[in-house]
Amino acid sequence: MSAIQRWLDRFCYKHPRFGIPNLMLVIVVGNVLVWLMDQFSYGVSLSALLAFSPYYILHGQIWRIITFVFVPLDSNLFFLAVSLYFYYMIGSVLEREWGTAKFNVFYGLGVLLNVVVGFLLYAVTAPLYPSHLLPLLTTASMTYVNLSLFFAFATLYPNMQVLLFFIIPIKIKWLAWIDAALFGWSVLSSLFGVFTSGLAALPGVIIPLVAILNYFIFFWDNFLQLFGRVKYQTSRQTVNFKKATKQAQQQKG
C-alpha cells in the first residue's frame, strides 16, 4: 500500500464523520434544481452563473469553484434523468462500501483536481482568445469526476450487470473497458498531436490524466496486484513448461 493510501485510510478511520452523508443525493438534487431553474427562467441561465469560468472566478465570483458541480451536463431531461440516476446509484453503493469519509475524500479530490485542471487549461488557452471572449470560457465540468466514479465502481464490482439501452444485459467491467479505451484513444490522439501540431496539443495529454488522478490514487494497489498476478501466472506457466519438456525428454530417453 502506498504512503498516500495509508494516510487516506488513517484519516478516514480517525474521522469517520468527515464529509457530507448521502453526498450523491445532494449532487443530484442540486442538478435537478438548476435544470428546473434554467427551464423556467427567461433570459437568465442559472447554469451560466454557476459554471466554472476562471475569468469570473479571478474577478471575484469565487462560488463558481464549488457550484459547477451542480451544473447539469445535459439539457435533455431524459438523458439527464438516466445519468443522474446512474451516478446516484453507483455513488451510493461506493459510500456504503467505503464509508462517508472515504467517499467524500474520493469525490472531493476529484473535484479539486478538476479545479486545478480548469485553471491550467485557462492559462494555456486564454492567450489564444480575444479578451472579450474570455468570460465565455468554461474550462471544468463534472465529466471526469463522473468518469472516475464509474471506474471506481467497475473496479469494485466488475461483474455487476446493467441493461445497456435498457435491453442488453452487460457486465459493468465491459462498459468500463470501453470507456477506458475511448479515454486512452483521446489521450493518445492528443499525444500524436504534440508531434504534429506542437505543444498546443499537450493539454489534451496532461489534463485528462490529472483530472482522474483520484482514481489512480485510490486504486493503485489494484493495478499492482493485477500486474503482479499476470506476471506470476506467466512465470508459473513458464516453469511448468520447462518441467513438462524435461519430463518428456526423460520419457523418450
Model-assigned labels for residue ranges:
Residues M1-K14, F195-G253:
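Cytosolic, positively charged, low-complexity intrinsically disordered regions immediately flanking transmembrane
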Residues V111-V115, K171-F183:
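Small-residue-rich segments of transmembrane alpha-helices in multi-pass membrane proteins
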Residues F119-A123, I178-F195:
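Hydrophobic alpha-helical transmembrane segments in multi-pass integral membrane proteins
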Residues F103-Y107, F165, L175:
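Alpha-helical transmembrane segments and their helix-entry boundary regions
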Residues P16-V116, Y122-A126, P130-H132, S197-P203:
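N-terminal TM1-TM2 helical hairpin plus the immediately adjacent luminal interfacial "cap"
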Residues V124, L128, H132-Q161, P169-W174:
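Membrane-interface micro-motifs in multi-pass membrane enzymes
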Residues V44-S45, Y157-I170, F219-K231:
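Juxtamembrane/interfacial segments flanking transmembrane helices
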Residues A81-Y85, T143-F151, I167, P203-D221:
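Hydrophobic core segments of alpha-helical transmembrane domains in multi-pass membrane proteins
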